[in-house]
Amino acid sequence: MSLKLDGKKLSLEIEERLNDYIFINKKIAKRAPGLAVIRIGEDPASGVYVNNKEKACSRVGIKSFIFHLKDNVEQKEVEQLINKLNFDKNIDGMLLQLPIPKKFDEQRLISYINPSKDVDGLNEINIGKLVKNEPAMRSCTPAGIINLLRSQNITIEGKKIVVIGRSLLVGKPLSLMLLNLNGTVTMTHSKTLDLNKVCKEADILIAAAGKPNLIDSSFVKEGAVIIDVGIHRLKSSDKNKTRLCGDVLLEDVIPKVLAYTPVPGGVGPMTVTMLLVNTIFSWQKQFGLSSTLNDLLP
């Protein structure tokens, strides 16, 4: 029987540790950790994601600061807000909720975030440190995936790992993290020739292509581990309802694999949890607190 890599269960276990850590250490720091979230515009999905992050912060004892800006705000005003938060001693982590309206220079805004507060790990300094395998903030989804694999003692070192997708949010940083952990990594994308053949060589296959049900059993070898990063909302057979699915056709793949992540409840919860972890690590460094959470670092 295939093993389900339950991200929801693991995230709750980690959150319990985070809650205990904050409870003990805020007596030393004299305050709880703080996370600032900047949302621009009225994208409905962004509203849901920000709400989820706010709730997660509340569960573990992180104080959240939500800045919801209208989409008619100017680039310079957002830059000024980021600079203000960079110097706010009550803010340990900061993120720009993506996507933002196209009129903004997204990468320029991210570059304004102090690397020590860049909990999404997207600032060019943090990306550069990842390339050099130096300590820095790591992207949340890749870090969550690595913790999922570790939770079931799934070996990374020496394994053939195929990553489908080359985004800055997932594919690129994940490939680098796995490489730093001595995995043998192949990064694929929409222009890869014979994608099916390449994927069938993988001991660990990670689908972050952004295409619903792209991967069926013909892409997967017997006994592989499959990680599904995708999440899509499709119409169900009942026209009035929708259903969630990933990049992987799970019902077709499960009989063949050693382990898999479900959608929902796999990678998603771990992404939010690693955001909390990054915020706490920034807080920990600021106050020289104990490093009992270091096993969560990718």
From Swiss-Prot:
HAMAP family: THF_DHG_CYH. PANTHER family: C-1-TETRAHYDROFOLATE SYNTHASE, CYTOPLASMIC, C-1-TETRAHYDROFOLATE SYNTHASE, CYTOPLASMIC-RELATED. Disulfide bonds: none annotated. This is Bifunctional protein FolD. Homodimer. Pathway: One-carbon metabolism; tetrahydrofolate interconversion. The keyword DNA damage does not apply. InterPro entries: Aminoacid_DH-like_N_sf (IPR046346), NAD(P)-bd_dom_sf (IPR036291), THF_DH/CycHdrlase (IPR000672), THF_DH/CycHdrlase_cat_dom (IPR020630), THF_DH/CycHdrlase_CS (IPR020867), THF_DH/CycHdrlase_NAD-bd_dom (IPR020631). Gene3D superfamilies: Leucine Dehydrogenase, chain A, domain 1, NAD(P)-binding Rossmann-like Domain.
